[in-house]
């Protein structure tokens, strides 16, 4: 381990295997707090590289509680959080809408990072249990078409890093690992990142991790597809990364200001998302969710973004997405 420390302290990049070895030791509690702090800051100052991020993700996945992975195609739609936008929870709403569009979703989520209501906070408000077994989650995925995997339930080793992360009070590699360590290991994903500088390295990381097809996005300060600014996209397809930009017009939608997506208290966010999923929400909310679902559908093989957007909007207005919420809550 000292050889790995020395490489980091000399601003050298770790191999994927070295990073995997290092993070396996971290989540097993083998590093002291000063050692862990030094490691995280050394990587942050140099800039974490794709093979290091991939190695860390592989260590966390190897040590996660197992999930019975299905043999059919399924997706994740998730963001890093931490964008500071305090928006409504678009990725969680999009997961329900995508599911109602017949796309299987195994969504990995956690408590809030920067908004007042993360995906798990919102699910709890809907009466959806967070601590169900992997077998029950798989059953929900099979029968309803959607399940949620609560990160702390699967990644118990995170607790060893938490005291240092709280003391450092700065972003580290742990802030970008969440979307990469879904224990269901989905072959397809739409991943939002909190900074445009992360789009390329996370896309390269997804290639290393073996995703079949995925898109990494950032838009005007938000970790998702947004309609107030161009969305920067790096799409993984057939082992290649394709870069492009999307605007509201590409989805057949009008632009909305970022302020139109502003969230509130957990109670407010729950009410706004409830109305949205029942087809009675604000137009800006419905359009934002439809755009994200449309891109996820493209990743799923449905290439026409405008057609996808209209299908998503019709699903939202029908209230079918809310039926998925009720079905999951009933199982809880």
UniProtKB/Swiss-Prot annotation:
Enzyme class: transferase
Summary of the function given for this chain in its UniProt record: Catalyzes the transfer of the phosphoribosyl group of 5-phosphorylribose-1-pyrophosphate (PRPP) to anthranilate to yield N-(5'-phosphoribosyl)-anthranilate (PRA).
Molecular functions per Gene Ontology: anthranilate phosphoribosyltransferase activity; magnesium ion binding
Binding-site residues, Mg(2+) 1: 91, 224
Annotated source species: Photorhabdus laumondii subsp. laumondii (strain DSM 15139 / CIP 105565 / TT01) (Photorhabdus luminescens subsp. laumondii)
Residues given in the record as Mg(2+) 2 binding sites: 223-224
E.C. numbers: 2.4.2.18
UniProt GO BP: L-tryptophan biosynthetic process
Record-given protein name: Anthranilate phosphoribosyltransferase
PANTHER family membership: ANTHRANILATE PHOSPHORIBOSYLTRANSFERASE
Binding site for 5-phospho-alpha-D-ribose 1-diphosphate: 79, 82-83, 87, 89-92, 107-115, 119
Cofactors named for this entry: Mg(2+)
Residues annotated for anthranilate 2 binding in this entry: 165
Protein's pathway: Amino-acid biosynthesis; L-tryptophan biosynthesis; L-tryptophan from chorismate: step 2/5
Signal peptide residue numbers: none
TM helices/strands, residue ranges: none
Catalytic activity, as annotated: N-(5-phospho-beta-D-ribosyl)anthranilate + diphosphate = 5-phospho-alpha-D-ribose 1-diphosphate + anthranilate
Keywords from the named record: Amino-acid biosynthesis, Aromatic amino acid biosynthesis, Glycosyltransferase, Magnesium, Metal-binding, Transferase, Tryptophan biosynthesis
Binding site for anthranilate 1: 79, 110
Pfam families associated with the record: Glycos_trans_3N, Glycos_transf_3
Metal-binding found in the keyword field: yes
